[in-house]
Amino acid sequence: MGGIKLFHASDLHFNAGYFEYILTLQDKFDIFCFSGDFLYKENAQEKEQVTLWLKSFKKPVFVCSGNHDMPPSWLNSIRGIYADDAIKTINGVKFGCVPYLCDDLLDFAECDILLTHVPPAKTNTSISKNDKDHGDIELARLIKNNLLKAKIILCGHIHEPKSHTDVLNGVKIYNSASNGSKEPFYQVIEL
C-alpha cells in the first residue's frame, strides 16, 4: 500500500451541509469511503438525493449500508460506486464493502480494507461515552483469531465513541461517525 489518500466519513444522516462540504474536498483525495447511514428517514426523496450526490464524485467511491439505509437495495442500484458486497482492488489494495447485518464476514477474508457500519466490539471505537458497547462481536472475534486479513476497518454507527481510532490485534480501526456538529467528522487515511 502506498501513495493513496482516503477520505472516510460515516453517519451523515441526510445532512445537506455535510454533503456540500464533502464535495468541496474532491480534489484533495484519491478515494472516498462512507460507512453507512446516509439517510435520516427512509424515503424516496432522500434516496434520490443521496444517489445523485454519490454519482457526482469524480473519484472512486466505496460505501456500505447502515441501519438507517435499510433495505439497502437502493445503494446497490447506484451505478459508478462500489456498494454492499463489492470487493475491488485499486493500486494493489483490496477493498471490501460489508453490508449491514452481513451473513458471512468471511466472504471478505482477503480484503485489506473493510468498510463496515458497526465497529468491532470491545474497542474504544465501539464503546460510547456512556460505556455501552454497541460493537460487532463476530467481527471482533474474526480479527482476534486472524481470520480476516484486513489491516484497516472503516466504520461508524457510534456517534460519540470513546475514541475515533483504535487497534485490535494489529488492525487499525477508524470510526468516522458524524455527531450532528456543523461540519461533518471525517478522517484522512494515507496508505
Predicted regions and their residues:
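Binuclear metal-dependent phosphoesterase catalytic core
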Residues: 2-3, 88-92, 107, 140-146, ...
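A structural preference for long, well-packed, hydrophobic secondary-structure segments
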Residues: 3-5, 13-21, 130-134, 146
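Active-site neighborhood of phospho(di)ester-bond hydrolases with catalytic His/Asp-centered motifs
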Residues: 7-11, 32-37, 61-67, 82-84, ...
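Core catalytic region of metal-dependent phosphoesterases/phosphodiesterases
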Residues: 9-90
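Short amphipathic alpha-helical segments and helix-helix/interface helices
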Residues: 19-23, 47-55, 105-106, 136-145, ...
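Glycine-rich phosphate-binding loop signature in dinucleotide/nucleotide-binding domains
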Residues: 25-28, 107-109, 147-148
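Cap/insert and terminal regions of metallo-dependent hydrolase folds
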Residues: 39, 50, 123-161
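Conserved catalytic scaffold of divalent metal-dependent phosphoesterases
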Residues: 62, 67-142
